[in-house]
Each structure stands twice: as structure tokens, then as C-alpha cells.
Regions:
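Conserved sequence signature across two-component system core domains
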Residues: 9-10, 33, 51
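Two-component/phosphorelay signaling modules centered on CheY-like receiver
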Residues: 12-31
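Acidic catalytic/metal-coordinating carboxylates
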Residues: 35-38, 58-64
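Short amphipathic alpha-helix used as the core "switch/output" element in two-component signaling
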Residues: 41, 63-75
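Active-site beta3 strand of CheY-like receiver
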Residues: 46-52
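As written
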Residues: 48, 62, 74, 94-99
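Active-site residues of response regulator receiver
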Residues: 54, 82
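Short, flexible helix-to-coil linker/hinge segments that flank and couple to helix-turn-helix
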Residues: 88-95, 100, 105-132
Length: 132
């Protein structure tokens, strides 16, 4: 059975390992990178089905990386995962082209659901943020 290929971008090793394990139940995590520039490069090289990216990364952040990726591939399916729930950042992430916005402290089933939604072309925002 085909498992969608997911690229993970997270600069904290412990968090990356936790997210990789969580995503690995439903998806094939093809690579994990630690910054936005590496994310853009890996996206071009690996052509994943979906991308899960932290916002706070060194150099190019997750929102800027989303803009760069979507400029090159308007169909890219990107879910941002972050500790930041401010409406300004949610709006910026979605405006950049992300289909999902999930808070790290609620990541779990919600992150998996967000990736599935993104793969189907649907938007998903953490329930805690009150936007869907």
C-alpha cells in the first residue's frame, strides 16, 4: 500500500525525532532537515507529497520557506507546526500558501489529520486556534 511521502523541517533534534515517530505511523518520512534553506533544496530534490515545517528555524524561517516553495510549486502541500498561536502568524502562514497550521503542544492526532487534509487539498488549523 502506498504511503504518502513527507518531508520534515524542524531544527530541534528531540522535537524532530518525536514528530518523525508520530508521522511515521501514517506516512513515509523521506527526510528531516534543520533550516528553511535546506527545506527548499530538499523539496526540489525529493518532491515529497507533503511537507511539515516548523516556523522558527535558523536562516530562512518556515513561512518564508513556504513562500519560496509555493512560488516554485503552487501545488505543494505544506503544514506548519509551531508553538506560536498568534492570529497574525496563522494568517501569515496561510497567506504564504500553507494548508495547515498546527500547534506543537497539540501535535499528535491533529498533526496527522492536518497532513491528511493537506494531501486532499483542504485547509486545517488547530482546533485550539478556533479557525478551520
Amino acid at each position: 500500500m502506498y504511503r504518502p511521502r513527507v518531508l520534515l523541517a524542524e531544527d530541534h533534534a528531540e522535537t524532530a525525532a518525536r514528530l518523525r515517530k508520530l508521522l511515521g505511523v501514517d506516512f513515509d518520512v523521506v527526510a528531516s532537515v534543520e533550516d528553511g534553506r535546506a527545506l527548499v533544496d530538499a523539496t526540489e530534490r525529493l518532491s515529497p507529497d507533503a511537507i511539515v515545517a516548523d516556523i522558527d528555524m535558523p536562516g530562512v524561517d518556515g513561512i518564508e520557506a513556504t513562500t519560496l516553495i509555493r512560488h516554485r510549486d503552487p501545488d505543494a502541500r505544506i503544514v506548519l507546526v509551531t508553538v506560536h498561536g498568534e492570529s497574525m502568524l496563522v494568517e501569515a502562514g496561510l497567506a504564504a500558501g500553507a494548508l495547515g497550521y498546527v500547534l506543537k503542544d497539540t501535535a499528535g492526532d491533529e498533526l496527522v489529520a492536518a497532513v491528511h487534509a493537506a494531501l486532499g487539498g483542504r485547509q486545517y488549523v488547530s482546533r485550539e486556534l478556533g479557525v478551520r
